[in-house]
A protein has these predicted regions:
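Hydrophobic transmembrane alpha-helices of multi-pass small-molecule transporters
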Residues: 24, 28, 34, 38-100, ...
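Alpha-helical transmembrane segments of multi-pass membrane proteins, especially transporters
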Residues: 57, 61, 83, 120, ...
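Hydrophobic core segments of alpha-helical transmembrane domains in multi-pass membrane transport
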Residues: 58-72, 107-115, 200-203, 207-211, ...
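Transmembrane helix-loop junctions in multi-pass membrane proteins
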Residues: 70-85, 118, 122, 204-220, ...
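Membrane-embedded alpha-helical segments and adjacent helix-loop junctions characteristic
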Residues: 80-179, 279, 308-397
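Membrane-core helix-loop-helix motifs of multi-pass transport proteins
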Residues: 177-267, 401-412, 418-463
Length: 463
C-alpha cells in the first residue's frame, strides 16, 4: 500500500460529513474564511469565488447586449430597446427572488434527507458496494482509502441533482487523492477519472430542475425525468470510455464488466420498453417513474434511519439548517446571471446568435427546433449559474412545456460546468498540468448535448 504524504496542517476543522463540508465550503472556518489550504501552495486557495473566466463571461453578456442595442438604435431606428433592457433588469431581479423562495425549500428539504442517509450508513454501504469497481477504475487508490468514501458521497449528491452540495465533498475527495499523487502539480489518473465523471453530470434525480419547472408553472415538473436519465447516461458512458482509452484501463476485467453490464442491461431494457410506447405514453411514463423514484428515495432514507435508530427528525433539522445556508448564499449569483441573460435577450443579441445557429443548422439540412435550447448548452461548460439563468429565461420566453424549454432542461441535467469544475477542483490542490482531462470532459459534454436533442425529439416531438 502506498504511503500517504504528509501535508501542511489545515487551519480549519475539517468537515467529516456532507453538511459540515458545505459549511466549510461556504466560509464558516474561523481562521481562513472561504479558503482551503492546498498541500502544494503556501497561501490559501480561494474556492468560494468563481474563476476569472466567469468574470469575462458575465462582462461579455453586458458588452454584447450594449453592441446589439446600439446597432438596433443607430441602424434599425429602434430607441425603445433601452427601455426594454431596463425593464428586463428589474423583472429578472424579481424573478431571482421568486426562484430563490422555492430553492430555499428544495435545498433545505434534500440536505435534511441526505443527513439522515449519512447517519443511517447508506453512504458507507454504497461505498462498500462500489469498492470493487473503483479498485479497477482507480488502481492506484488503495482499498479502504478515505477518497473512496468521499467520491461516493460526491456522486450521491450529484445523482440527486444537488450540485451545490456535491462541490465541497468533491474538493475533499480531490485533496485525499492528492495525497497519493506522485507529481504534485500534474493530475493523476485517478483525479482525471474523478473529474471527468463529475463533468459528465451523472444525475438520476434532478430535483433542482424539477424545482425550476415547478416554479415556472409546469403542469408536470418531472416530465423530463426519463430524457435526463438517458442523456446523462450517454454523457457518463462517453466520459468513462474516453478516459479508459487514454489511461488503458482494463474495462474487460470480469468485475468491471459485471458492473458495466448490469448498468447496460438496465438501460437497454428501459430503452427497449420505451420504444414500444407512443409519444403520449412516453410522457406519462416519464412522469410516473420520476415521481415514484423521487418519493421512493425519500422513503428509503427514512426507513434506513429508523432501522438504524437514527433520530430522523433531529437529523433532518440538523441537515436542513445547512441547506438553508447554502440557498441563501446562492441568491447574489442568481441575480447576477439572470439579469445578465435578461439584458442579452432584451437587446436582441441572444436572438441574433440563435438565428445565426439556426441558419447554419438549416443549411446542412437538419431540423432546427432544438436551436432555441442551445444557449443553455453553450454556456454550461463555463458557468452553472449562467446556464441556469438561460434555462429559466428559455422557459419564460417559449413556455415551460415547450420543446425548447424541455430540451434545455434536459441539457441542463446532462451536462456540467466543465471549466468551473476543473478550475476549482484542480486549483484547490495546486494542479497545473491537467493532461487529457479537458478533452475527455468536453467529449462527455458533447455526448450529453447530442443525446438530449435526440431523446427530446423522440419523447416530445416538436410540441
Amino acid at each position: 500500500m502506498q504511503a500517504r504524504r504528509e501535508q501542511p496542517p489545515v487551519r480549519c476543522v475539517a468537515a467529516r460529513d456532507l453538511g459540515g463540508a458545505i459549511v466549510f465550503m461556504l466560509g464558516q472556518c474561523s481562521r481562513y474564511p472561504r479558503a482551503v489550504r492546498s498541500p502544494t501552495m503556501a497561501r490559501p486557495v480561494l474556492i468560494g469565488t468563481r474563476p476569472f473566466m466567469l468574470n469575462r463571461l458575465w462582462l461579455g453578456f453586458f458588452l454584447a447586449a450594449a453592441v446589439a442595442a446600439l446597432a438596433r438604435w443607430l441602424l434599425g431606428g429602434d430607441p425603445a430597446v433601452f427601455a426594454a433592457i431596463v425593464e428586463s433588469l428589474f423583472s429578472m431581479a424579481k424573478l431571482s427572488v421568486d426562484v430563490m423562495l422555492l430553492l430555499f425549500g428544495t435545498l433545505t428539504l434534500w440536505m435534511g434527507l441526505l443527513r439522515i442517509a449519512e447517519r443511517a450508513g447508506l453512504v458507507t454501504a454504497l461505498a462498500r458496494a462500489l469498492g470493487p469497481l473503483f479498485r479497477r477504475l482507480m488502481p492506484e487508490v488503495p482499498e479502504g482509502h478515505p477518497a473512496i468514501g468521499l467520491i461516493t458521497l460526491n456522486f450521491a449528491a450529484n445523482v440527486l441533482g444537488l450540485d451545490n452540495a456535491a462541490t465541497p465533498v468533491g474538493l475533499r475527495a480531490m485533496r485525499e487523492l492528492q495525497t497519493l499523487n506522485p507529481s504534485s502539480d500534474t493530475a493523476s489518473n485517478a483525479q482525471i477519472l474523478f473529474l471527468v465523471l463529475n463533468a459528465s453530470s451523472l444525475t438520476l434525480l434532478p430535483v433542482s430542475i424539477f424545482m425550476y419547472r415547478a416554479q415556472q408553472g409546469a403542469a408536470d415538473p418531472t416530465l423530463v425525468f426519463l430524457p435526463i436519465l438517458l442523456a446523462t447516461s450517454a454523457s457518463t458512458l462517453v466520459g468513462l470510455l474516453s478516459v479508459a482509452f487514454m489511461q488503458r484501463l482494463k474495462l474487460w476485467d470480469p468485475v468491471a464488466l459485471a458492473y458495466l453490464a448490469a448498468v447496460a442491461l438496465l438501460l437497454g431494457g428501459l430503452i427497449a420498453f420505451l420504444t414500444t410506447l407512443s409519444a403520449a405514453a412516453l410522457a406519462s411514463a416519464s412522469s410516473l417513474v420520476g415521481n415514484l423514484a423521487l418519493f421512493g428515495v425519500i422513503i428509503v432514507f427514512l426507513l434506513a434511519g429508523a432501522i438504524k435508530r437514527v433520530p430522523v427528525y433531529e437529523a433532518f433539522i440538523e441537515g436542513a439548517k445547512q441547506g438553508f445556508d447554502v440557498a441563501r448564499d446562492l441568491l447574489p449569483y442568481l441575480v447576477a446571471m439572470l439579469c445578465a441573460v435578461g439584458v442579452l435577450r432584451a437587446s436582441g443579441a441572444l436572438g441574433y446568435a440563435i438565428d445565426g445557429i439556426r441558419w447554419v443548422v438549416k443549411g446542412v439540412g437538419l431540423n432546427t427546433d432544438f436551436v432555441a435550447a442551445l444557449p443553455t448548452a453553450l454556456v454550461k461548460p463555463f458557468s452553472g449559474s449562467a446556464a441556469r439563468a438561460m434555462l429559466i429565461e428559455t422557459m419564460q420566453h417559449y413556455g415551460v412545456d415547450s420543446f425548447p424549454a424541455l430540451t434545455a432542461a434536459t441539457m441542463q441535467g446532462s451536462t456540467e460546468t466543465t471549466f468551473y469544475v476543473l478550475a476549482v477542483y484542480y486549483g484547490a490542490v495546486g494542479i497545473r498540468r491537467v493532461r487529457h482531462t479537458v478533452g475527455c470532459a468536453l467529449l462527455a459534454d458533447l455526448a450529453g448535448i447530442v443525446a438530449s436533442i435526440a431523446v427530446c425529439t423522440w419523447f416530445f416531438g416538436t410540441r
